[in-house]
């Protein structure tokens, strides 16, 4: 206990955590603000199926894009460890490899996205109006996929070098452009649901181009040159691809859970899927704010592991954990006492509001339950322990399935209870793995890349 108190009182660690976390919290919060603006603008159109189309279409797009989240996570861990070693050549190679992977994956996903969306909508069994608008929204969003994946790689690389200002510039520019164009296209030009999708596409390309322009200045701090010949060798790609493979499997499992919630909600009716979308915007707001602290954990823990500094690793975790717990408590209180205002702000469709109000207590409980999984993700990403993340998520989903099946009869209440249980299991499995690694000094054993 005395060690924990001493670590918490270490002012330099607080400064390092917040130097990274504050810009990332600001930029991360802008991400769910876009979803909030989408929901608010579309939610004030006359029909529930219009809001439902944005919710389902965005869920389809997010399933594809966020499954590629390994582009950010893998880049962060390797870049942080390279920065800890002062290896400029490795930093350049990691950046280029991340961008090349992003482009290749965007092309493949763009080709697969349309038929996969048709299959998904078939299983959802939406109304005819919801089906048509969802397809139009999703097909338009696919044009922004290359830029979105490139931004993942860029943000991850910048975070690994402990540069939080560049991700702030990328994400803020993306999301502010999205908000402005959303208001113009949907309300001004009256393009409706497709207008919201077009705004997102233009915004994603804006952010990616800004990020590319900022890499040149960032690289000046690290001397070195790209070993072009090494890019043609399998050995230079193998560590990154191995980590990315495992994070991809983990991300796919995670996004499958979120996607299945949308699918099951759609089967319960247009009002239910719309209400769940509004509530999940609250989770997005919480998750992206807490992820700012988790991103600090990624960079600081990865740097400490690269420098083989056990004390710095422990102090970073203690300080980030303390602030994350305080923030999650704040969000829980906010949703408990001001949740109705949060819902009313997003839509004036009365049956959607009434449905969402019923499930507000679940949203209030989520931050306190989910915070631990976000922090542990940051630790494992910084340590490039992707295999353990994959195994933890696989075990979580396996343990969750029988509960999800048993709770089907409870309707949307069963859906939310399942989701809360998913977050509990996710934290428990990763926490157990982290405890085993700590006891075996596994965070430092053979982790130099």
Regions found by a protein language model. Give the residues of each.
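Helix-loop interface residues and adjacent transmembrane-helix termini in multi-pass membrane transporters
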Residues: 36, 45-48, 82-85, 160-161, ...
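Small-residue-rich hydrophobic transmembrane alpha-helices
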Residues: 53-111, 148-162, 166-167, 275-337, ...
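Membrane-helix interface/capping residues of multi-pass secondary transporters
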Residues: 39, 48-51, 88, 164, ...
């Amino acid at each position: 206990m005395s060690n924990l108190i001493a670590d918490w009182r270490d002012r330099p660690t607080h400064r390092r955590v917040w130097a990274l976390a504050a810009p990332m919290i600001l930029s991360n919060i802008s991400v769910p603000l876009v979803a909030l603006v989408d929901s608010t603008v579309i939610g004030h159109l006359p029909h529930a199926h219009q809001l439902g189309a944005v919710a389902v279409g965005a869920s389809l797009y997010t399933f594809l894009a966020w499954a590629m989240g390994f582009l950010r996570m893998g880049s962060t861990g390797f870049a942080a460890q390279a920065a800890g070693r002062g290896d400029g050549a490795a930093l350049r190679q990691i950046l280029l490899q991340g961008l090349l992977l992003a482009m290749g994956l965007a092309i493949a996903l763009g080709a697969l996205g349309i038929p996969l969306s048709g299959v998904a909508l078939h299983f959802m069994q939406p109304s005819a109006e919801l089906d048509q608008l969802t397809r139009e929204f999703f097909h338009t969003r696919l044009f922004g996929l290359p830029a979105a994946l490139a931004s993942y790689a860029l943000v991850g690389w910048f975070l690994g070098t402990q540069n939080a200002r560049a991700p702030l510039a990328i994400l803020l520019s993306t999301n502010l452009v999205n908000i402005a164009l959303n208001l113009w296209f949907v309300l001004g030009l009256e393009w409706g649901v497709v207008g919201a999708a077009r705004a997102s596409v233009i915004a994603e390309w804006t952010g990616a181009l800004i990020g590319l322009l900022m890499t040149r200045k960032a690289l000046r701090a690290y001397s070195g040159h790209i070993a072009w010949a090494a890019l043609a060798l399998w050995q230079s790609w193998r560590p990154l691809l191995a980590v990315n493979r495992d994070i991809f499997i983990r991300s796919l499992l995670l996004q499958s859970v979120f996607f299945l919630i949308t699918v099951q909600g759609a089967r319960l009716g247009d009002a239910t899927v719309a209400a769940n979308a509004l509530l999940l915007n609250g989770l997005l707001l919480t998750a992206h704010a807490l992820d700012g602290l988790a991103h600090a954990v990624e960079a600081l823990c990865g740097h400490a592991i690269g420098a083989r500094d056990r004390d710095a690793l422990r102090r970073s975790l203690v300080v980030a954990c303390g602030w994350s717990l305080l923030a999650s408590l704040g969000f829980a209180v906010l949703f408990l006492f001001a949740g109705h205002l949060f819902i009313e702000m997003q839509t004036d469709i009365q049956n959607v509001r009434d449905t969402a109000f019923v499930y507000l207590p679940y949203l209030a409980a989520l931050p306190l339950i989910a915070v631990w999984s976000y922090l542990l993700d940051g630790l494992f990403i910084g340590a490039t322990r992707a295999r353990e993340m994959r195994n933890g998520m696989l075990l979580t989903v396996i343990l969750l399935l029988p509960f999800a099946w048993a709770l089907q009869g409870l309707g949307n209440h069963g859906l939310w209870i399942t989701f809360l249980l998913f977050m509990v299991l996710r934290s428990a499995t990763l926490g157990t793995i982290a405890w085993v690694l700590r006891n075996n000094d596994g965070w430092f054993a053979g982790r130099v890349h």
